[in-house]
């Protein structure tokens, strides 16, 4: 049975522990395990979580950050949690939530979880980031870590919605879209409903469910739905155009080169591409420089190619200069410009 592993990211004070406690209170079946990472020697959040739900499997990784010094410990911890005996009558663990420190970057954590043993166990990783509707925009502007957490997220949970007016919340959604147009934004004022959305099962191919058409449609809606977003000065959203006749090997080599050039500046990649040597479009996605297995979208109607790259402090010009003969040509873009080009993708 697949196990969902949620990387719960978010800047300092953005409400990660509160969100985690809300999830644990709603888990009447006791199917959730928790790993809490804190950079200091004293694990305050771990104590708070244990006090809020003292019957859950909980491991504290302290005095180090899982995005750097504790990466090998994390893989061992996940394996040990899955192998640990369950109480009599208890169900198997269905999900594990890793609450990261407020200064962690999700990309290296996802890379450390790309472990063959964890893959064999059917671990499915989703990055959920909390976004503080009081200080979120300031944090993203001032701290690289906050921008990286937002840029790598597959889902962004708005917190402290009760402290801001609806128009302010809409402005924060625009900030999020400017950094990461791929993310599903959870902004439900019904807290229980929001928690369910944030920690919903990812499904066999990632957060989108319902087959190939639904998967591709969700990509388009995430990229092009809604009003044009406010661009972040250091986060670049790039659109890619696939060269006619390019093969899968061409694209795979380009992805390797892209990851090498960008390093930890690469935040997200998501694409649906029709290469010359495959009958079906191929779905590609990454968090940071760690790519999931490509997936053929069987049964998807003919469509234009979609390719979006999100990076920090490196833009399309930099990448094109390094890879002038690449099978995918990148250009800096705003949502409105890409939307116009892609308006007939799923007609």
Locate predicted features.
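C-terminal accessory "lid"/substrate-recognition subdomains
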Residues: 148, 152-155, 161-301, 312-347
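Flexible loop/N-cap segments at domain edges
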Residues: 309
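Conserved catalytic-core segment of NTP-binding enzymes
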Residues: 109-182
């Amino acid at each position: 049975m697949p196990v969902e592993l949620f990387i719960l990211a978010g800047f300092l004070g953005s409400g990660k522990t509160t969100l985690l406690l809300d999830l644990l209170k709603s888990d009447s079946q006791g199917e959730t395990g928790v790993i809490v990472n804190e950079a200091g020697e004293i694990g305050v959040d771990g104590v708070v979580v244990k006090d809020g739900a003292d019957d859950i499997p909980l491991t504290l990784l302290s005095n180090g950050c899982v995005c750097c010094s504790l990466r090998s410990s994390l893989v061992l911890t996940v394996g040990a949690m899955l192998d640990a005996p369950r109480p009599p009558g208890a169900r198997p663990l269905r999900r594990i939530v890793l609450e990261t420190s407020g200064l962690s970057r999700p990309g290296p954590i996802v890379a450390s979880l790309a472990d063959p043993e964890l893959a064999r166990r059917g671990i499915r990783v989703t990055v959920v980031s909390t976004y503080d509707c009081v200080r979120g925009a300031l944090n993203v502007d001032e701290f690289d870590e906050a921008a990286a957490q937002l840029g790598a997220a597959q889902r962004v949970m708005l917190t402290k919605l009760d402290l801001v007016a609806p128009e302010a919340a809409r402005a924060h959604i625009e900030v999020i879209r400017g950094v990461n147009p791929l993310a599903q934004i959870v902004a439900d004022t019904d807290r229980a409903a929001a928690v369910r959305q944030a920690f919903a099962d990812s499904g066999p191919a990632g957060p989108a469910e319902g087959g190939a058409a639904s998967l591709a449609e969700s990509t388009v809606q995430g990229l092009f739905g809604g009003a044009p977003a406010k661009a972040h000065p250091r986060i670049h959203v790039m659109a890619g155009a696939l060269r006619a006749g390019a093969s899968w090997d061409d694209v795979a080599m380009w992805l390797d080169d892209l990851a090498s050039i960008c390093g930890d500046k690469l935040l997200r990649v998501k694409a649906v591409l029709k290469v010359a040597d495959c009958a079906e479009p191929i779905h590609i996605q990454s968090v940071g420089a760690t790519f999931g297995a490509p997936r053929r979208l069987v049964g998807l109607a003919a469509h234009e190619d979609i390719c979006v790259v999100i990076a920090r402090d490196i833009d399309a010009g930099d990448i094109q200069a390094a890879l002038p003969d690449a099978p995918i040509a990148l250009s800096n873009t705003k949502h409105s410009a890409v939307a116009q080009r892609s308006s007939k993708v799923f007609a």
